[in-house]
Curated annotation (Swiss-Prot):
Family statement drawn from the similarity comment of this UniProt entry: Belongs to the Rv1128c/1148c/1588c/1702c/1945/3466 family.
The organism of origin for this protein: Mycobacterium tuberculosis (strain ATCC 25618 / H37Rv)
Region (Disordered): 142-222
Native organism taxonomy: Bacteria, Bacillati, Actinomycetota, Actinomycetes, Mycobacteriales
Highest taxon above the source species: Bacteria
Biased composition (Low complexity): 160-169
InterPro entries: DUF222
Basic residues: compositionally biased ranges: 182-196
Protein's UniProt name: Uncharacterized protein Rv3466
UniProt xrefs under Pfam families: DUF222
């Protein structure tokens, strides 16, 4: 990246604003369908190249500006000044750390961490969505308890602690007693609730039988 004076930087930004104003005033009615597609392609290329310029500014702010100068953290300063959300500001800071120019402790300029991706962005070949996918591929896996777990596979703390305790309990058993067998839960017998008889129930049954049931036939009627 070439060096420039403050006047040169202001001049370049002013020229860019002027050219964008001219482009905004252009009518595309005379273009054919292939020409309109080509114009959109060139416009997309310009839009993709612009974030590469911001990476250098963000990295310089991150390395040189203090929270007193920024009025808070870099993320909050970008969100307030650029009128964007804090997640968007955090994403831009992360993109700049991977794709922007860097400097060593001795002041020597260093290439971006993702050199090929940064070059493709400066050329307008890839956009924000491409950068997001590429950065996800190079993101290290999350470490938990010193072990790297593959994505989509998590260990349950309770199950892991029980397995470790069961392995440790084996050697602590006295000789001749063998390994400890897992404790079984007591079997729950399903019992039917006992029918409670009312104290007047036999008398009621006799009354109903005598009133509603016919008398048994006598021997003379047989």
């Amino acid at each position: 990246m070439g060096s420039g004076s403050r006047e040169r930087i202001v001049e370049v930004f002013d020229a860019l604003d002027a050219e964008l104003d001219r482009l905004d005033e252009v009518s595309f009615e005379v273009l054919t369908t292939p020409e309109r597609l080509r114009s959109l392609e060139r416009l997309e290329c310009l839009v993709r190249r612009l974030p590469a310029v911001g990476h250098a500014l963000i990295n310089q702010l991150d390395a040189q500006a203090s929270e007193e100068e920024l009025g808070g953290t870099l993320c909050c300063a970008l969100a307030n000044r650029l009128r964007i959300t804090k997640p968007d500001a955090a994403r831009r800071i992360a993109d700049a750390a991977d794709l922007g120019p860097r400097r060593a402790l001795t002041g020597e300029p260093l290439a971006p961490q993702l050199t090929a991706t940064a070059t493709a962005q400066r050329q307008g070949l890839i956009g924000e969505a491409h950068v997001k996918v590429i950065r996800a591929l190079f993101r290290p896996p999350a470490r938990r308890g010193g072990c790297v777990h593959p994505p989509g596979r998590r260990s349950r703390p309770g199950r892991q602690s029980r397995s470790i305790s069961s392995r440790r309990a084996g050697p602590l058993r006295p000789a001749g007693h063998g390994l400890a067998t897992p404790r079984r839960r007591p079997h729950r017998h399903r019992t039917r609730p006992q029918t409670r008889h009312h104290p007047e129930q036999p008398a009621i049954r006799r009354h109903v039988t005598a009133k509603w049931l016919p008398d048994p036939p006598s021997a003379g009627h047989l």
